[in-house]
Amino acid sequence: MTESKNDTKSWAPKQIWIKDVLKKSGTELLDISKSPAKAVAVKKSPAKDSATTKMVYYSANQLLIKTEQSSQAQFCLQVPPPLTATTTSVGLGVPPSGGQQEHFELLQTPQQRQMQLQLQDQHQQEQQQFVSYQLAIQQHQKQQQQQQHESITNAAPTAAPSAQRIKTEPVGGFPASAAVVSQVRKPSASKPQFKCDQCGMTFGSKSAHTSHTKSHSKNQDLSLNGASGAGVAAPVSTAAIELNDAGLPVGIPKSPTIKPLANVAAGADPYQCNVCQKTFAVPARLIRHYRTHTGERPFECEFCHKLFSVKENLQVHRRIHTKERPYKCDVCGRAFEHSGKLHRHMRIHTGERPHKCSVCEKTFIQSGQLVIHMRTHTGEKPYKCPEPGCGKGFTCSKQLKVHSRTHTGEKPYHCDICFRDFGYNHVLKLHRVQHYGSKCYKCTICDETFKNKKEMEAHIKGHANEVPDDEAEAAAASAAASTSAGSSAGSPSLQGVSSNSESSNHSPPSSPPATKKPRQARQPRVSKTVAATLSIPTSSPLSPSSLSSTYSPSASSMASPPPTSAHYLPVQMEADALSRDSGVSSAQPAHSTYADEEPTDLSMQQVQGQLPESTVDYYQAPPSLLELQPQPAGLTINPALLEAASIARRHDDNDDQVQDEDVHAAAWQMMQLCRGHGSLPPTEQPAPSHQPQVPTLHVSDLAANYDDTHEATVLIEHFKRGDLARHGLHKGYAPVPKYESALPNPDVVRRVEAAIGLRSSTESPERSSSPESDSLMMADRNVMTLPLRKRKHYMNKGDDGQVDSEKASGDGTSAAGGAASVGAGDGPGSKVMRMSSVIQFAKAS
């Protein structure tokens, strides 16, 4: 460099001496520190001074001497700034060639010149080493392509969708840029390959390549340590690594030497790998490790035929196909195939991002994400499309897989609404918006929609928490229904006015269950009465099973003082049309009927013919049903008296009184209801009692069993106490109250109802095959009133088939009084009728 600036005294004479020397040679010396800044570029010299040359001088810097020819018109300093403006930089100045050109010379000390020459020599040596190394890699790569194992090159590209990449570790003296350039990718192949740069082996997946390269770390460390200890750079072998027929490096056997070491220290592993000298405790681990050197993969997936070197890896991989995910996140509930995925997933909740990009400082959760991200900086695209003529590259295998669908036409995503197929998931999501709107996830339970899948899954879990509560409520409701059904016979006045067939609650269900509404909790009498009054007009017409086919309702309704438009339907008769299998009749005429209906009881046709101006018509069932079922017989008991007797027995004398005219009107209706059967000659019939009846009962027997005076007296005495008003009878309505037995045994209840009920229904298509219904007996009837085609449905088994009245009524006479036994009694020699259907009027409500 230059002399010291502090020695100004010694430097001043030198400046004078230099000026004198330069003046003699026609050169002028300028001090830039004392001259203006713009004096760096010297103005054009006059023609007369063109022979003189000016020199630019920087104080405390190197001196640059510039000479010009006399023919040049302008002086221009073209030296690079590091050579003239800085004091520490050392450049590689090369004087330009040419006689007429400018000549630059850098004034340097001998030490600086020697240092510069050493750096140049070192740089040239490094370049030569790098070039030789690159030539060795390329030569070995060509040989490897020719001798590659057939099982690796012919494998399907989908078996291991990973990139082919040859990684080379830079030698100690190489610059960092050399390591980047040395990553030579193998030319296009059907399957990406990863090649070990030390032994020349190729692998179809990145994980196998990484595992294999680790096996060389021990030998590599030893060689590097030996080379550094000797002080000599490790020589780079230019010879290619030889491979055998199996594609393995020459010198590596197919199987390891499984023999414990002779001199092993206590606690050390006795089994050593003969390739990398790594030791293991058991031979199985040595065999598994040795596959990283040989590349053997004996375990194959039966689903996708992917090969694995470790059996445990195959077991974990198989869970992808079997959808088994035993490792579950405690935070969000997501499950994974193996513990490693769960461990990486937990970083999402903890916020840990341990992998950081050295270029842009971006962080990642997984190391694979960082590797893919680094390719955006390096521009590497190792995943090439194998389709001829395409040649597109991608940074990750997933992008290549999606791109390949453009060539194969695969559309793996399906719309569950219109069944259209799509090749991309994001296109399917956009399509589903057309069906669902922006909220394209729909709950399968309540049809609520959500914007994303997580919200829908959380919502469905809420439904799962509600299931036990619903089951508890259903159990409580069923218990309440059974309790109310069991206690309904004890207090029939609390149930409102309904059909007497309601008592058969436990009969086998042959009618549709939807026709019977579940019973609600008990309400006060006033509210139940109002509900009964409001529900009457909405009742459906009676089916042919009702008593309207046996009674003569037109005569009774026209002769009665109340209006003929009175509703005779019970409260719960909505399902009457669906209960034609019942053996118990409602004994009520229909309010709204049809003009083409005819009575099913042929004995009543004469009475119908005498009243051509009747206001009540009847509905005729389909002929197919009439031909298959027997016709009804005569009435056996008056349900009104049964209800009157039960009410009189259960209620005390403190009830409210009702007006006498309403009581008389209701009693008169019931008496006229019975008088309609007086057209046929009556026979001698004993009074209602527990004694057996006469063997043959006719339809007209009912008229002789009732005394008008006694009947009216009984009704007036008991209905005066408010019972009639509570049953809706004080305003002209005369429905027959419901009769329910107090017996807890449903079998006894069915037998009593079969004995006292009317057999007037046609067979329903929903005929039950219950053995209990077939074993029920019913009272004798006048079979001669049926058509000839109907009689074949009845089997006469003689006079020995008597049904005991005590067994038929049982304890049920406590609720029905003596009238129950009247309808149930069968004298000796009565005909035994086997019922072919189930009592269903209990389910009609």
UniProtKB/Swiss-Prot annotation:
<dbReference type="GO" id="GO:0008270">
    <property type="term" value="F:zinc ion binding"/>
</dbReference>
<feature type="zinc finger region" description="C2H2-type 8">
    <location>
        <begin position="441"/>
        <end position="463"/>
    </location>
</feature>
<dbReference type="GO" id="GO:0007552">
    <property type="term" value="P:metamorphosis"/>
</dbReference>
<keyword id="KW-0862">Zinc</keyword>
<feature type="region of interest" description="Disordered">
    <location>
        <begin position="469"/>
        <end position="610"/>
    </location>
</feature>
<feature type="zinc finger region" description="C2H2-type 7">
    <location>
        <begin position="413"/>
        <end position="435"/>
    </location>
</feature>
<feature type="compositionally biased region" description="Polar residues">
    <location>
        <begin position="582"/>
        <end position="591"/>
    </location>
</feature>
<dbReference type="GO" id="GO:0045316">
    <property type="term" value="P:negative regulation of compound eye photoreceptor development"/>
</dbReference>
<comment type="function">
    <text>Plays a general role in the hierarchies of gene expression leading to metamorphosis.</text>
</comment>
<dbReference type="GO" id="GO:0042594">
    <property type="term" value="P:response to starvation"/>
</dbReference>
<feature type="zinc finger region" description="C2H2-type 2">
    <location>
        <begin position="271"/>
        <end position="293"/>
    </location>
</feature>
<feature type="compositionally biased region" description="Low complexity">
    <location>
        <begin position="532"/>
        <end position="559"/>
    </location>
</feature>
<feature type="compositionally biased region" description="Basic and acidic residues">
    <location>
        <begin position="796"/>
        <end position="809"/>
    </location>
</feature>
<feature type="zinc finger region" description="C2H2-type 5">
    <location>
        <begin position="355"/>
        <end position="377"/>
    </location>
</feature>
<dbReference type="InterPro" id="IPR036236">
    <property type="entry name" value="Znf_C2H2_sf"/>
</dbReference>
<dbReference type="GO" id="GO:0010977">
    <property type="term" value="P:negative regulation of neuron projection development"/>
</dbReference>
<feature type="region of interest" description="Disordered">
    <location>
        <begin position="141"/>
        <end position="164"/>
    </location>
</feature>
<feature type="zinc finger region" description="C2H2-type 4">
    <location>
        <begin position="327"/>
        <end position="349"/>
    </location>
</feature>
<dbReference type="InterPro" id="IPR013087">
    <property type="entry name" value="Znf_C2H2_type"/>
</dbReference>
<dbReference type="GO" id="GO:0000978">
    <property type="term" value="F:RNA polymerase II cis-regulatory region sequence-specific DNA binding"/>
</dbReference>
<dbReference type="Pfam" id="PF00096">
    <property type="entry name" value="zf-C2H2"/>
</dbReference>
<dbReference type="GO" id="GO:0005634">
    <property type="term" value="C:nucleus"/>
</dbReference>
<feature type="zinc finger region" description="C2H2-type 3">
    <location>
        <begin position="299"/>
        <end position="321"/>
    </location>
</feature>
<keyword id="KW-0217">Developmental protein</keyword>
<feature type="compositionally biased region" description="Low complexity">
    <location>
        <begin position="759"/>
        <end position="775"/>
    </location>
</feature>
<keyword id="KW-0863">Zinc-finger</keyword>
<feature type="compositionally biased region" description="Low complexity">
    <location>
        <begin position="810"/>
        <end position="823"/>
    </location>
</feature>
<keyword id="KW-0479">Metal-binding</keyword>
<protein>
    <recommendedName>
        <fullName>Krueppel homolog 1</fullName>
    </recommendedName>
</protein>
<dbReference type="GO" id="GO:0006355">
    <property type="term" value="P:regulation of DNA-templated transcription"/>
</dbReference>
<keyword id="KW-0238">DNA-binding</keyword>
<feature type="zinc finger region" description="C2H2-type 6">
    <location>
        <begin position="383"/>
        <end position="407"/>
    </location>
</feature>
<dbReference type="GO" id="GO:0035075">
    <property type="term" value="P:response to ecdysone"/>
</dbReference>
<dbReference type="GO" id="GO:0006357">
    <property type="term" value="P:regulation of transcription by RNA polymerase II"/>
</dbReference>
<keyword id="KW-0677">Repeat</keyword>
<feature type="compositionally biased region" description="Low complexity">
    <location>
        <begin position="498"/>
        <end position="508"/>
    </location>
</feature>
<feature type="zinc finger region" description="C2H2-type 1">
    <location>
        <begin position="194"/>
        <end position="216"/>
    </location>
</feature>
<comment type="similarity">
    <text>Belongs to the krueppel C2H2-type zinc-finger protein family.</text>
</comment>
<dbReference type="GO" id="GO:0003700">
    <property type="term" value="F:DNA-binding transcription factor activity"/>
</dbReference>
<dbReference type="GO" id="GO:0005829">
    <property type="term" value="C:cytosol"/>
</dbReference>
<feature type="compositionally biased region" description="Low complexity">
    <location>
        <begin position="474"/>
        <end position="491"/>
    </location>
</feature>
<feature type="region of interest" description="Disordered">
    <location>
        <begin position="757"/>
        <end position="845"/>
    </location>
</feature>
